Amino acid sequence: MNYLVSFADSRMYKSLIRLSKQAHTFKFFDKIFLLNEYNLSNSFKKKFKNNLILGSKGYGYWCWKPEIIMNIMNEINNGDCLLYVDAGCHLNIHGKKRLLEYFDLIKKQNKGIIAFQAVEPNKKNSKLKYDGRKLRNLKNYKWIKGDTLDYFKVRDNDTVTNAQEIAGGVFLIKKCEQSIKIIKEWQKIIYTKFDLISDTPSVSANLSGFIENRHDQSIWTL
C-alpha cells in the first residue's frame, strides 16, 4: 500500500486542500493523510504546549513531524510505503513517472528511507538521471548549531560538516525495523533535547560560517 502524509496547522488549511487535489490527480495513493493540530494526541499537546502556538515558526519548530509519522506507521503494515511532504510542497503530475521510480526504489531497499540532498545522483547506485539544474549549497556547518554537532559527536568530522543537509520537507519511508528505529530516535531527541531544534543560542560554539539552525531538519540530517 502507498500513502501520502502531510501536516499543517489550521491557518494553512487551504494548502492541505490544494495538496489533496494534486494528490488525487496521481490516482496512485491508497490513502491520503492530511493532518492538523487536532490530530495530535492530548499528551503530545500537553508536553509541547509552550511551543505549539499558531503563527510560530513551523508550529513549534516542526516538533510534530516524527510524531505524526510514527502515528501513521503504527497504523500501516510492514512493507507499506509513505511519502511525506511539507504542506507548502506541490505535487506535479508531470513528475509522476519519477515519483513511481522512487516508490519502486524504496520497496527494493532494506533501510526503508529515501531522503534527498542537493547533490547529483550517485551513478554507482542510482539509475536516476541528473537534469543539470543548479543545486543549492546547504552544507551542514552553516545550518546545524554547535550543540547538535556535539550531541551526535560529529563536530570534528569534516565529511559530515561539509556534507549537504538532508531535506526534511520531502522523503519516503517503507515501514520496516530500520525505518521505525530511525523515526523513534528522531522523536526521542525532540522529546528530550528540544533545544536542539529550537532557535535558542547554542551553548557550545557554532562552526565558522554558521548561519542559523534548521530545526527538525538538522536532527533528520544527522
Predicted regions and their residues:
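Glycosyltransferase catalytic domains, chiefly GT-A lineage
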Residues: M1-L222
